[in-house]
């Protein structure tokens, strides 16, 4: 319960309320000290606007977290595959850092600039006990979006080996020599290209994910692709970084990457719509429309 007041006699009610709101212009010093919030312009419409912005901030944090956690799952899956399939890791540590501290940063921050969603003021108040990271968010991030990205990344890894004439049994036989860096130069070159493909696929999938995360409820077709231009700026910087990591000789040595064939780059174009369409279908299924 929120209570507004401006006089000395309102102080007890302002203290007892869940949220005490004192008038900034006409309110007394006693009322302002007793309140939780001071309404600087004495305009009650500002309270409504503040609530709407507060809900937008809460929603945007959830969008940000969904986006980040999804890529974490995609980064974790290659190491599960290494353990259970006895293959070399499809990502190396510095490539994971390139995603977490490089390519993911600006698109994630752009989600924090999303405007309040339509109908957000029609939703009931959240319970105090409701966690920010609840089960539906974690399931969506880890078990749906992240799992799809991880499977796509592993698909890219195996695709590079397959196009070079290796099946999974042969890859398992090479695992020990690759991990010890004792494999021949040709094998190591293929391995670096395969991990680079995994890295690029996950980054490309995150482009679809950032649009999917713009709303937990609404379709991207309703929101529009160009209503948050910061996302496009983030994607542009993201691809400048990832292409530099892939094609710069200096960065290749640091991140253990290799130049990708043009045909591999064309495959990356399929990744964003794969993630976005899958989440659009999930939203439609949940809404029942």
What are these regions (language model features)?
Residues 13-14, 61, 249:
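Hydrophobic residues within well-ordered alpha-helices
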Residues 1-2, 24-218:
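Membrane-embedded transport module
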Residues 7-17:
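Acidic, divalent-metal-coordinating active-site segment for phosphoryl/phosphodiester hydrolysis
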Residues 1-4, 281:
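Phosphate/ATP-binding catalytic cores across multiple sugar-kinase/actin-like superfamilies
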Residues 9-10, 46, 283:
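Residues immediately C-terminal
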Residues 112, 173-176, 196-289:
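C-terminal transmembrane module of polytopic membrane proteins
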């Amino acid at each position: 319960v929120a209570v507004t007041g401006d006089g000395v006699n309102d102080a007890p009610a302002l203290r007892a309320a869940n949220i005490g709101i004192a008038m900034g212009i006409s309110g007394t010093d006693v009322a302002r000290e007793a309140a939780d919030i001071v309404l600087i312009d004495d305009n009650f419409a500002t309270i409504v606007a503040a609530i709407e912005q507060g809900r937008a901030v809460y929603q945007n944090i959830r969008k940000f977290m969904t986006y980040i956690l999804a890529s974490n799952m995609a980064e974790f899956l290659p190491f599960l595959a290494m353990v259970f399939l006895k293959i070399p890791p499809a990502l190396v540590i510095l490539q994971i850092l390139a995603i977490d501290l490089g390519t993911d940063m600006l698109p994630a921050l752009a989600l924090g600039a999303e405007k309040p969603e339509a109908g957000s003021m029609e939703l009931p108040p959240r319970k105090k006990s409701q966690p920010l990271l609840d089960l539906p968010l974690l399931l969506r991030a880890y078990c749906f979006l992240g799992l799809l990205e991880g499977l796509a990344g592993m698909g890219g890894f195996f695709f590079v080996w397959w196009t070079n004439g290796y099946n999974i049994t042969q890859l398992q036989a090479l695992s020990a020599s690759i991990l010890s860096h004792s494999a021949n130069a040709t094998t190591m070159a293929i391995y670096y290209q395969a991990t680079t493909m995994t890295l690029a696929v996950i980054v490309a999938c995150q482009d679809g994910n950032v649009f999917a995360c713009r709303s937990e409820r609404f379709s991207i077709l309703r929101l529009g692709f160009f209503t948050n231009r910061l996302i496009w700026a983030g994607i542009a910087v993201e691809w400048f970084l990832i292409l530099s990591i892939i094609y710069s000789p200096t960065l290749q040595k640091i991140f253990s990457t290799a130049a990708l064939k043009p045909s591999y780059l064309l495959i990356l174009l399929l990744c964003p719509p794969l993630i976005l369409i899958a989440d659009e279908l999930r939203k439609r299924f949940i809404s029942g429309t």
